[in-house]
Regions:
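Small-residue-enriched core segments of transmembrane alpha-helices in multipass membrane transport
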Residues: 12-15, 522-544, 555-562, 623-638, ...
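Interfacial segments of transmembrane alpha-helices in multi-pass membrane proteins
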Residues: 2-4, 404-405, 409-424, 428-429, ...
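Non-transmembrane, solvent-exposed regions of membrane trafficking/translocation machinery
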Residues: 22-31, 49, 65-77, 81-433, ...
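Interfacial helix-loop-helix hairpins and adjacent transmembrane helices
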Residues: 1-21, 26-67, 90-128, 156, ...
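Juxtamembrane "pre-transmembrane" interface segments
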Residues: 204, 448-452, 460-507, 780, ...
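Pore- and gate-forming transmembrane helices of large, multi-pass membrane proteins
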Residues: 177, 489-509, 561, 581-617, ...
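Cytosolic juxtamembrane regions of multi-pass inner-membrane proteins
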Residues: 560-604, 647-655, 872, 878-940, ...
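Hydrophobic alpha-helical transmembrane segments of membrane transport and translocation systems
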Residues: 531, 538-539, 575-596, 600-687, ...
């Protein structure tokens, strides 16, 4: 063996590096076990804090460098944030209102929503259509782009400046998000910009148990503003006039709505604000218990028809508070106060904004305040903004209530003093991200630059708000377009199931190798497997990549790849021994002859793994990472390390009589001469019929698409008692109603086999950007299940807590926005096609014959069609989920990567025999090559199926669908290598397959 020194050096370096990085995990375990001995939780945390920064490698270093666990193993939260590129463009254009710009923005938004694409390009194309003959510089020669764009700039120069500014906004947003998460104290977060998806940032936060706090913190743009205000009595007459004009049909759009007003109090206040006649007619008094509910709804509808605004908005409140309204009426009120008629009636310098939280004395009723802000600047912006804040702290006021105290810079302090001096006796509204957090009365001039945000806050609220303000302002609004939340208890169960499946699969592989190849070769292969796992974990830790359940599956599958390499080598050694060579020569020839097949099969798998890594997100990337590492490491351990050991032993005259077979495998597929090629008519007919059945099933039954492809929300709910999915579907029928009155689609499927776990899917308000919709959806789900006596939790908060299992709870949730769903769909199609094209080209380059490329690609396409077809035929008929999601697409690509191994091994043997017998009968040569590799095919497929069956049975629900797809792929991939790929390659070579006689095929001469 050549280059032994390099192999030894690499092995030693890998060993030392793996020991170094894995040692951090052992150190963390030691500190945690010492802390666990302390009973008092506060003292326990004090101990961890005391050692947090001690030593060269402190406890904090160990935490940050140990093996990270993904969400499915540790619990936590995964989100994809989308930075609003349209908002960036509007800021760069200084919020222009001319028709060309506004129409172009509207058209670009519509095109992006319908088809996706680069928003900047969509806008520029739309602008040229809506404003022909006008240059982009007319819109973007603004203060924001001063020095980059002038009125004389060409469109190309403006586009370059816009793209640079958009990228700067995304980069700044990324930094702000990272700072906020660091301040929140998340250990080992994974934050990355998604390549090829402009404006999207993926954030993985293991261990997070309060998703509501994280949603608010991540989506808050920290756009802090200080506004002067109107007094409520100044605005009330305008609102009364607006109400009258809307009721009289002034705008021609307001329709009669049967939505009931929130409370009797609101209606009484409306009456007070109206003339006596209206009061007598529309004041709705409290009914006695016998009153009909239908009659009450009719009166409410009549009141709303007569007073569209004031039947929903209770006037009064004092200072800047012009009125109160139930949260369910705010959408209808917004439609009125932002309507065209409102622009004509209300003062032009008036802005109406809602409070961030319900009013203190009306919190239980979910009543919000409407504040009247006064625009005092020519630009329409607030006179004082958050860029003047130098520090923010969460504190307590004199009454012991949580508040946020802020300090301003010199310029901010000067403006703050002027502003408070000019508004003594009035309120100044403190607005954050478009909602009013507080509007305190100004009692006198405030100098020194101090200010305070108070309100109906909890300690967590003020802490998060202070951290958000200190982290800086987001350059553009961000919203969560995809989200997954996993409870820690579910993560612990996943760890247990993952470890069990891994250990059982590993033990079975070791037993299988010894059973098939005898003790010494079998244990050598097993030693290579152990080293493989050790190196894989070490490299994974050094990359600071999180270990997920799909990642664990990738590691287990890489063991199958490692076994395949050992099987190829051992089968070659057995051939050389049967030809009469000595042990040294047989081992050398076995390793040498198997190298090309191992190299090609591993490289094609690697190509698929890289495609998975670059196109996938979340769990798919976790799987791809460990699989890629496993492929590289298994190649090194199987081809080089085991060779070192054999050479060492044989050079010292040991293992000279080593056996590479057992009574079980001695005659396995030896001397077989099956006539595979002449079966092509039968096998092609079966394949075509199967393809027709599968395609027909796509049209008749379709596929069970997950929210990854449709958009929506998933909630995995665990009940105390077994329930039927049909029962859940009936209970939730009509519960989720969108804002436009349409019913949201709702589904339910069973997860696992205990009958207590159901996954609920709905597309409720999935188009909405409101951060409150997530909470609303969970509340609707809780109320519907509670009403049906399916859950017994006393509050929605307990129902949403994944650790409170008794009484039923949500143990995990997922959200996928419609734009992400479209991108996932296109990404899935492109990734599969790209994988097939990449493998086609590689086979063409390596085998220098298009016939092998065509044969392998057709067979791979059939493999993928078969797996998808079975999912179409079987969904709803088997006791586990067969939804088409991102994980399934990962499985398809993995099937492609694994299946090509079989094809490459067979084609490699055909290529070798073509060189050895250039004048031999081609058909017999093809048959002989397939027969010669049958033992390898059976051993590799069996060992891989052992691994996959362990994952399928023991690995848990989250990985069961993936392993089922892989099982189908291994079975049909093996068959297609023999019955489709080889005959197809032969036919493309221009050969006609002959009908062979009944006797066995003669050996190739």
């Amino acid at each position: 063996m050549q280059n032994k020194g390099i192999v030894i050096c690499v092995a030693v370096l890998l060993t030392l590096a793996s020991i170094f990085y894995l040692s951090f995990s052992f150190a963390t375990r030691y500190y945690d076990s010492e802390a666990a001995k302390i009973k008092d939780p506060i003292a326990q945390q004090d101990y961890k804090d005391s050692v947090k920064y001690l030593g060269v490698y402190s406890y904090q270093n160990c935490l940050e460098t140990q093996i990270g666990l993904g969400l499915d193993l540790k619990g936590g939260m995964n989100v994809i944030l989308e930075i609003s590129v349209p908002d960036v463009l509007e800021n760069l254009a200084d919020h222009k209102t001319d028709a060309g710009f506004t129409n172009a923005m509207k058209e670009a938004r519509a095109q992006e929503e319908a088809n996706g694409g680069d928003f900047v390009s969509l806008f520029i194309n739309a602008y040229h259509k809506s404003a022909p003959g006008h240059k982009l510089a007319e819109v973007f020669a603004t203060q924001q782009l001063q020095g980059k764009v002038s009125p004389q700039s060409s469109d190309a120069e403006v586009e370059k400046a816009i793209r640079a500014s958009v990228q700067d906004a995304i980069d700044n947003s990324f930094n702000v998000v990272r700072t906020r998460i660091d301040k929140f104290g998340v250990v080992q977060p994974n934050i990355q910009k998604l390549e090829g998806q402009q404006g999207r940032i993926m954030v993985e936060m293991p261990g997070i148990s309060q998703p509501e706090r994280m949603r608010k913190m991540l989506q808050g743009s920290a756009n802090l503003e200080f506004w002067e205000t109107y007094n409520s009595e100044e605005i009330a007459p305008y609102l009364q006039q607006l109400d009258t004009r809307i009721a009289n049909g002034d705008n021609g759009e307001e329709k009669t709505d049967s939505v009931a007003a929130d409370s009797t109090v609101a209606k009484k206040e409306v009456a007070k604000a109206e003339p006596k006649k209206a009061e007598a007619k529309f004041s709705i008094k409290k009914k006695d218990d016998a009153a009909s509910k239908v009659g009450e709804e009719a009166q409410n509808a009549a009141a709303i028809k007569a007073h569209p605004l004031l039947a929903r908005l209770q006037l009064g409140g004092g200072l800047s508070t012009v009125g109160y309204a139930s949260v369910r009426d705010t959408a209808a009120i917004n439609k009125i106060i932002y309507s065209a008629v409102a622009k004509r009636v209300l003062p032009s310098d008036l802005r109406l904004l809602w409070s961030a939280k319900p009013a203190d004395n009306l919190k239980a009723k979910n009543i919000f305040e409407l504040h009247a802000l006064k625009v005092t600047t020519t630009t329409g912006r607030a006179p004082l903004e958050g860029d003047v804040i130098t520090d923010a702290k969460d504190e307590f006021d004199q009454m012991g209530s949580p508040v946020v105290s802020m300090k301003m810079n010199t310029e901010g302090a000067r403006k703050w003093a002027q502003m408070t001096k000019a508004n003594v006796g009035k309120a100044i509204a403190i607005v954050l991200d478009g909602v009013v957090y507080s509007a305190p009365r100004v009692n006198g001039e405030i100098d020194g630059g101090s200010s305070q945000i108070s309100g109906n806050f909890t300690i967590e609220d003020t802490k998060d708000l202070a951290n958000t303000l200190k982290s800086g302002r987001m350059p553009a609004p961000a919203r969560i377009v995809q989200e997954e939340v996993v409870g820690p208890t579910l993560g612990a169960q996943s760890i247990q199931m993952g470890i069990v499946s891994f250990v059982v699969a590993f033990v079975l592989l070791m037993v299988y190798m010894v059973m098939m190849y005898n003790v010494i070769p079998g244990m050598m292969a097993n030693l290579a497997l152990l080293v493989n796992v050790f190196f894989t974990l070490g490299i994974l830790t050094s990359f600071q990549a999180a270990l997920t359940l799909p990642g664990l599956a990738g590691m287990v599958l890489s063991l199958g790849t490692a076994v395949d390499a050992n099987v190829l080598i051992y089968e070659r050694i057995k051939e050389e021994l049967r030809s009469g060579k000595g042990m040294k020569q047989a081992v050398a020839a076995g390793y040498g002859n198997a190298f090309s097949a191992i190299f090609d099969s591993n490289l094609t798998s690697l190509i698929t793994g890289v495609i998975l890594l670059t196109t996938g997100t979340g769990p798919i990337r976790g799987f791809a990472t460990t699989w890629i590492i496993g492929i590289v490491v298994s190649f090194f351990t199987a081809v080089f390390l085991t060779r070192l050991v054999y050479d060492y032993k044989l050079n010292h005259d040991k293992w000279m009589h080593c056996k590479f077979d057992t009574p079980v495998s001695h005659n396995l597929m030896q001397g077989k001469k099956y006539k595979f090629m002449s079966m092509y008519k039968t096998t092609f007919t079966v394949a075509i019929v199967a393809a027709v059945v599968f395609i027909g099933s796509f049209f008749v039954r379709g596929l069970s698409k997950s929210i990854d492809f449709t958009g929506g929300r998933n909630y995995v709910v665990q009940f105390e008692n077994p329930v039927e999915p049909e029962q859940i579907r009936t209970v939730l029928g009509g519960a989720f109603v969108n804002a436009d009155g349409t019913k949201a689609t709702t589904g339910a499927i069973a997860i696992g086999t205990d009958g207590k776990t159901i996954r609920v899917s709905t597309n409720y308000m999935i188009e909405s950007n409101s951060p409150t919709v997530d909470d609303e959806a969970e509340t609707i789900l809780y109320n519907a299940l509670k009403k049906a006596n399916l859950v017994s939790q006393k509050s929605v908060e307990a129902f949403k807590n994944p650790d409170v299992r008794q009484g039923g709870s949500i143990i995990s949730s997922t959200k996928v926005g419609p734009s992400v769903a479209k991108d996932i769909t296109m990404g899935a199609i492109y990734s599969v096609l790209f994988a097939l094209i990449a493998i086609f080209l590689y086979i063409l380059i390596r085998f220098r014959n298009v016939a092998f490329s065509v044969g392998s690609t057709v067979a791979l396409a059939f493999d993928a069609l078969t797996v998808i077809g079975f999912y179409s035929l079987l969904w709803g008929l088997v006791p586990f989920s067969l939804e088409i999601d991102q994980t399934f697409i990962g499985a398809i690509l993995t099937v492609v990567g694994y299946s090509i191994n079989d094809k490459v091994v067979v084609f490699d043997r055909i290529r070798e025999n073509l060189k050895l017998h250039p004048k031999g009968d081609r058909q017999q040569l093809f048959n002989a090559s397939i027969n010669e590799t049958l033992a390898r095919t059976i051993n590799t497929s069996t060992s891989t199926l052992l691994v996959l069956l362990c994952i399928f049975i023991l690995g848990g629900d989250s990985i069961r669908s993936f392993s089922f797809a892989m099982i189908l792929g291994v079975v049909f991939g093996t068959l297609s290598s023999i019955f489709i790929a080889s005959p197809m390659a032969y036919i493309v070579l221009g050969r006609k397959i002959k009908e062979e006689p009944a006797e066995e095929v003669a050996e190739v001469k």
